[in-house]
From Swiss-Prot:
The chain crosses the membrane at residues 249-271. The keyword DNA damage does not apply. Residues 1-35 form the signal peptide. Residues 36-248 are extracellular. It is a single-pass type I membrane protein. Belongs to the tissue factor family. It comes from the Eukaryota. One of its GO terms (cellular component) is extracellular space. It comes from Bos taurus. This is Tissue factor. InterPro entries: FN3_dom (IPR003961), FN3_sf (IPR036116), Ig-like_fold (IPR013783), Interferon/interleukin_rcp_dom (IPR015373), Tissue_factor (IPR001187), Tissue_Factor_CS (IPR030472), Type-II_Cytokine-TF_Rcpt (IPR050650). A lipid is attached at C274 (S-palmitoyl cysteine). Residues 272-292 are cytoplasmic.
C-alpha cells in the first residue's frame, strides 16, 4: 500500500492540547512572578508574661502584608491580625481559653495588593507553645509587711491574669494553685548575709532579731517546670524602727529633763527657805545691838 506523499494536515486535537499546555505554563509563571517579592516570616517567637501573649516575627514588610493563624494542636486554624504590616500579633484571647493546651501559629505572607494573588500564600510555622508551662512569671508585689518584736510578717499580692472563669479574671494563684511558690530573701539592714524562706501560700511569718531592721524581696517560683521557673525579684522593702526609737528616746530625755527641773525647783525652794531662815536668825541676833 502506497504511502501518501502530500503535505501533513495538522490534527486539531493536538493543537488544542499544545495551547492548553502553553496557557498553564503562563499561569504558573505568572504565579511564580507574583510571589517573588513576597518574603516569608522568620524568627517567629512567643512573648508571654502572666499569660499575656504576643507572637512576634521578622522582617518588616515592604511590598507585602501578613496574616496570622493560630490553632490548638488538634484544632482548626483561626485567622488573627488580617493583612497587617505589623510584625507582632496579640493572641492572648485565644490561648487563655485553655492555658494547658499546646498551640501552634503560622504567619502567612501576601502581596501588598492581595486582590491580585491567585496562589496559596507562603507561610512559616512557629514553635509549639504551652502557656501553662512556658509563660513567664511577672514581677511579684509585696502587698504589706510588719515587724513586731521578733516576728516579721510579709504578704505577697498575686498578679491578675487575663484568664477567665465564670466571667471573672483569675489570679496566678487561681491558675497555678499549689504549683505557685514564693521565696522570700531577707537580711539585716546592717549586713549582707541573706536567708530565705519558701511558701506555697501568700504569707510569710519568720523569726527575726528584736530591734533590728530587715530588708527583703520576694520571687515567684513554679518548681514543677523545667524552664521559666522563676520570676524577676520584687523591689526591695525594708523595715524601720526609727520612729519607735525616736519616741523612746524622746520619752527618756523628757523624763530626765522633768527630774532635773523638779530637782532644780526643789533645790531653789530649799535654798530660798534656808536663806530666809538665816536672814531671820541674823535679824534676831542683830536686834539688841542695834537697840543699844
Amino acid at each position: 500500500m502506497a504511502t501518501p506523499n502530500g503535505p501533513r494536515v495538522p490534527c486539531p486535537q493536538a493543537a488544542v492540547a499544545r495551547a492548553l499546555l502553553f496557557g498553564l505554563v503562563l499561569i504558573q509563571g505568572a504565579g511564580v512572578a507574583g510571589t517573588t517579592d513576597v518574603v516569608v516570616a522568620y524568627n517567629i517567637t512567643w512573648k508571654s508574661t502572666n499569660f499575656k501573649t504576643i507572637l512576634e516575627w521578622e522582617p518588616k514588610p515592604i511590598n507585602h502584608v501578613y496574616t496570622v493563624q493560630i490553632s490548638p494542636r488538634l484544632g482548626n486554624w483561626k485567622n488573627k491580625c488580617f493583612y497587617t504590616t505589623n510584625t507582632e500579633c496579640d493572641v492572648t484571647d485565644e490561648i487563655v481559653k485553655n492555658v494547658r493546651e499546646t498551640y501552634l501559629a503560622r504567619v502567612l505572607s501576601y502581596p501588598a495588593d492581595t486582590s491580585s494573588s491567585t496562589v496559596e500564600p507562603p507561610f512559616t510555622n512557629s514553635p509549639e507553645f504551652t502557656p501553662y508551662l512556658e509563660t513567664n512569671l511577672g514581677q511579684p508585689t509585696i502587698q504589706s509587711f510588719e515587724q513586731v518584736g521578733t516576728k516579721l510578717n510579709v504578704t505577697v499580692q498575686d498578679a491578675r491574669t487575663l484568664v477567665r472563669a465564670n466571667s471573672a479574671f483569675l489570679s496566678l494563684r487561681d491558675v497555678f494553685g499549689k504549683d505557685l511558690n514564693y521565696t522570700l530573701y531577707y537580711w539585716k539592714a546592717s549586713s549582707t548575709g541573706k536567708k530565705k524562706a519558701t511558701t506555697n501560700t501568700n504569707g510569710f511569718l519568720i523569726d527575726v532579731d528584736k530591734g533590728e531592721n530587715y530588708c527583703f524581696h520576694v520571687q515567684a517560683v513554679i518548681l514543677s517546670r523545667r524552664v521559666n521557673q522563676k520570676s524577676p525579684e520584687s523591689p526591695i522593702k525594708c523595715t524601720s524602727h526609727e520612729k519607735v526609737l525616736s519616741t523612746e528616746l524622746f520619752f527618756i530625755i523628757g523624763t530626765v529633763m522633768l527630774v532635773i527641773i523638779i530637782f532644780i525647783v526643789v533645790l531653789s525652794v530649799s535654798l530660798h527657805k534656808c536663806r530666809k531662815v538665816r536672814a531671820e536668825r541674823s535679824g534676831k541676833e542683830n536686834t539688841p545691838l542695834n537697840a543699844a
